[in-house]
From Swiss-Prot:
Keyword tags: Phosphoprotein
Family: Belongs to the PBDC1 family.
PANTHER family for the chain: PROTEIN PBDC1
Domain of life: Eukaryota
Modification sites for Phosphoserine: S126, S181, S197
Region (Disordered): 167-233
Keyword Transcription regulation included in the entry's annotation: no
Protein name: Protein PBDC1
Residue runs in coiled coils: none
């Protein structure tokens, strides 16, 4: 899930400070609005990358961490009946739920990098990251639920929906191209027919002119013959 930059441009001191701030657990801060905004931006970037992944690749084949098998096994052992296609926020945020989630999350401290970082989690897995469909959760909680959604086939709804839309766009674009090609061909054929027709008319006129001239010459020849006959007599 990590992304790297291909540039070696110097990083400003301000960005270094923000990066350092984001490398610390969320509980290290109070309600600092700047830090909260930085956390929100980082969480949103993570969400965008993840949504693009499950939209472009069959989620059943995705591997989110090096320990997906362990996360999934522990998750279903501790939350066997938890519904994950549409989450109930109370199953994640209530005091009793937090008590149950805490030992599970701490088990991955040192195993999963940034295990307790704030991450955006979708409530309804068939929908995208909207304000109404998103809650904040520790990253290990995000991994546990999303790995389960991928393996159990729930996230495939997003993949199928996006692929269907792209397929429709392709069909529509193909139809437009074929229509344009047909118009061009008709225009071209019409032009050729028009040119041919014009040539035929010109040829007809030329033939008529030649015929008329031929007739006149014939009449003149007849006159000359008649004159010769009269002289001969």
């Amino acid at each position: 899930m990590a992304a790297t930059s291909g540039t070696d441009e110097p990083v400003s001191g301000e960005l270094v400070s923000v990066a350092h701030a984001l490398s610390l657990p969320a509980e290290s801060y109070g309600n600092d609005p700047d830090i909260e905004m930085a956390w929100a931006m980082r969480a949103m970037q993570h969400a965008e990358v993840y949504y693009k992944l499950i939209s472009s690749v069959d989620p059943q084949f995705l591997k989110l961490t090096k320990v997906d098998d362990q996360i999934y096994s522990e998750f279903r052992k501790n939350f066997e009946t938890l519904r994950i296609d549409v989450l109930d926020p109370e199953e994640l945020k209530s005091e009793s739920a937090k008590e149950k989630w805490r030992p599970f999350c701490l088990k991955f401290n040192g195993i999963v990098e940034d295990f307790n970082y704030g991450t955006l989690l979708r409530l309804d897995c068939s929908q995208g990251y909207t304000e109404e469909n998103t809650i904040f959760a520790p990253r290990i909680q995000f991994f546990a639920i999303e790995i389960a959604r991928n393996r159990e086939g729930y996230n495939k709804a997003v993949y199928i929906s996006v692929q269907d839309k792209e397929g429709e766009k392709g069909v529509n674009n193909g139809g437009e191209k074929r229509a344009d090609s047909g118009e061009e061909e008709n225009t071209k054929n019409g032009g050729e027919k028009g040119a041919d027709s014009g040539e035929e008319k010109e040829e007809g006129i030329n033939r008529e002119d030649k015929t008329d001239k031929g007739g006149e010459k014939g009449k003149e020849a007849d006159k000359e013959i008649n004159k010769s006959g009269e002289k001969a007599m």
